[in-house]
């Protein structure tokens, strides 16, 4: 080598090595970032009232009075206003898929004990359709969300002393003397998909659990508290196809029983051939009424343990917690300090393929003078690897 060519060749060699290293680094970075961001949300809307007094009633008279209290509380918690705040939460996060629970449909009819004894609800006059009201707020000015699966759950109708006054029911004397109306509650679970965001859904499915809580109301009548699940296969902006499941497990069972009703329902989800058992990566959202780290009573964690034993792992933040505003009759009072445990979850059975990018808890402050729900919402942005 001459004195003039050696430095040039050394510089060329150094440049080549640097270029090779840069290419390798770029390739490694592309590989690590390979995947698609998918945004999901779980949102319990709160049906609008506490059903416990009716469930615990011991006579027909106390049952009708308790039902009247439920009707009045639904009015007081004002879903038409709460829907505005709920829509703001959802639109603020822009999830591609949303799992909704307690999407109540309230209907009414003249007072009658017939539907109680027959077990066949008959009321058709709509008082509040939570799904319709929420979609109206979400799609105001532009269609942004559509329901892809709707599943009816608990559906029950009974007479109610709606105004709380004695003796003014149209039925005159007797058991219906105080009842002005029949109230019908149809609980629903719903999956929403974002419009115009590259969300493609297929294979919608829905069903009820076979294991249900049975309660005795009015001291005699046994009713089943129907709960279930919804699911859909989806791709988002060209992502790998995945299986999205939304569910709401039992809330009123005895958590100290082993296995509890909610634990058995979780078992149905993850059983071979169950809605959360798929060859595709599964993303499950919902109100499991269960957690291990923030267990309120011994046994509360059973359902969550069933999920983790089946290979499911959390894909959402654990803090702040989101359940529940219990002290407020009308959702106008109370503090987010009451949200001291976790029951709403976002999970996956394929933690190697589904990575958590970011997560947020929504609805921990009042809007429009009301808490949006007794629950907070839960949002996660996930990276689904190809």
Tell where the protein language model's regions lie, with residue ranges:
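A well-ordered secondary-structure block
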Residues: 138-140, 144-242, 246, 354-362
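Bacterial N-terminal signal peptides
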Residues: 11-23
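Solvent-exposed loop/turn segments at secondary-structure junctions
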Residues: 45-49, 103-107, 152-157, 197-198, ...
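Active-site beta-strand/loop signature of hydrolases that rely on acidic residues for catalysis
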Residues: 40-45, 82, 86-112, 117, ...
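N-terminal, active-site-proximal structural segment of metallo-dependent hydrolase catalytic domains
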Residues: 28-171, 386
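Metal-dependent phosphoester-hydrolase catalytic domains
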Residues: 197-208, 233, 256, 260-263, ...
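Surface-exposed intrinsically disordered loops and tails
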Residues: 59-77, 110-125, 157-182, 203-222, ...
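Bacterial N-terminal signal peptides that target proteins for export
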Residues: 1-14
């Amino acid at each position: 080598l001459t004195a003039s060519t050696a430095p040039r060749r050394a510089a060329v060699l150094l440049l080549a090595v640097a270029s090779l290293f840069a290419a390798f680094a770029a390739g490694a970075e592309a590989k690590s970032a390979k995947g698609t961001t998918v945004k999901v949300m779980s949102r319990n809307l709160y049906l609008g009232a506490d059903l416990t007094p009716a469930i615990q009633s011991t006579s027909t008279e106390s049952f009708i009075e308790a039902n009247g209290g439920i009707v009045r509380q639904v009015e007081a918690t004002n879903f038409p206003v709460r829907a505005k705040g709920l829509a703001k939460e959802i639109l603020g996060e822009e999830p591609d898929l949303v799992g909704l629970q307690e999407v109540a449909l309230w209907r009414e009819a003249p007072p009658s004990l017939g539907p109680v004894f027959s077990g066949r609800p008959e009321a058709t006059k709509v008082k509040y359709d939570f799904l319709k009201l929420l979609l109206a707020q979400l799609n105001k000015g532009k269609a942004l969300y559509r329901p892809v699966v709707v599943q009816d759950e608990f559906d029950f109708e009974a007479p109610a002393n709606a105004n709380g006054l004695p003796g003014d029911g149209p039925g005159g004397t007797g058991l219906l003397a105080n009842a002005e109306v029949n109230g019908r509650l149809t609980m629903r679970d719903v999956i929403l998909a974002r419009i115009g965001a590259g969300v493609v859904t297929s294979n919608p499915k829905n069903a009820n659990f076979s294991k249900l809580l049975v309660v005795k109301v009015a001291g005699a009548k046994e009713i089943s508290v129907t709960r279930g699940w919804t699911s859909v296969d989806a791709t988002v902006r060209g992502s790998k196809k995945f299986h999205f499941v939304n569910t709401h497990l039992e809330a009123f069972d005895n958590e100290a029983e082993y296995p509890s009703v909610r634990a058995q329902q979780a078992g149905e989800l993850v059983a071979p051939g169950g809605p959360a058992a798929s060859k595709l990566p599964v993303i499950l959202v919902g109100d499991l009424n269960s957690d291990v780290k923030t267990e309120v009573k011994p046994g509360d964690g059973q359902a969550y343990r069933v999920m983790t034993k089946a290979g499911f792992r959390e894909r959402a933040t654990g803090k702040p917690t989101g359940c529940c505003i219990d002290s407020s009759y009308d959702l106008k009072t109370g503090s987010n300090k009451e949200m001291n445990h976790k029951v709403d979850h976002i999970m996956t059975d394929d933690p190697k393929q589904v990575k958590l990018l970011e997560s947020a808890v929504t609805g921990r402050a009042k809007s429009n003078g009301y808490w949006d729900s007794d629950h907070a919402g839960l949002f996660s942005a996930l990276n689904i690897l190809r």
